[in-house]
């Protein structure tokens, strides 16, 4: 995968520890050139079949003013998964916004919860 003792960057987000493994991925926020910016979200990884790409699902409540009740909603976000992170389907992950990596991928996984 990567060289032993490779440089690990501090991405500047509190509560996120850098991974112990290294990787050669250019789009890794810890070992590559990808910078994280914008919002930080939490969700459940529901699909991890494509190479280095997955889908994170977030459940949230939406207030309907007409009926004065909350309804459950969910959103699915396409994410890039660096190979240095050990995540699998069903894990709760922390994702951060970054520049567009692909047509529909603008978030990257930065850790497990």
Curated annotation (Swiss-Prot):
Quote the CDD domains the UniProt record gives: Ribosomal_uS17
What is any one GO biological process for this UniProt entry?
Answer: translation
Entry-linked InterPro entries: NA-bd_OB-fold, Ribosomal_uS17, Ribosomal_uS17_arc/euk, Ribosomal_uS17_archaeal
Q: Which Gene3D superfamilies match?
A: 2.40.50.1000
Instruction: Enumerate the Pfam families for this protein.
Output: Ribosomal_S17
Cellular component annotations (GO), alphabetically ordered: cytosolic small ribosomal subunit
Keyword Ligase among record annotations: no
Q: Which UniProt keywords apply?
A: Ribonucleoprotein, Ribosomal protein, RNA-binding, rRNA-binding
- GO MF terms on file? rRNA binding; structural constituent of ribosome
NCBIfam families the UniProt entry points to: PRK08572.1, uS17_arch
Entry similarity comment: Belongs to the universal ribosomal protein uS17 family.
Subunit comment: Part of the 30S ribosomal subunit.
Functionally, this protein is described as follows: One of the primary rRNA binding proteins, it binds specifically to the 5'-end of 16S ribosomal RNA.
- For this entry, the protein name equals Small ribosomal subunit protein uS17
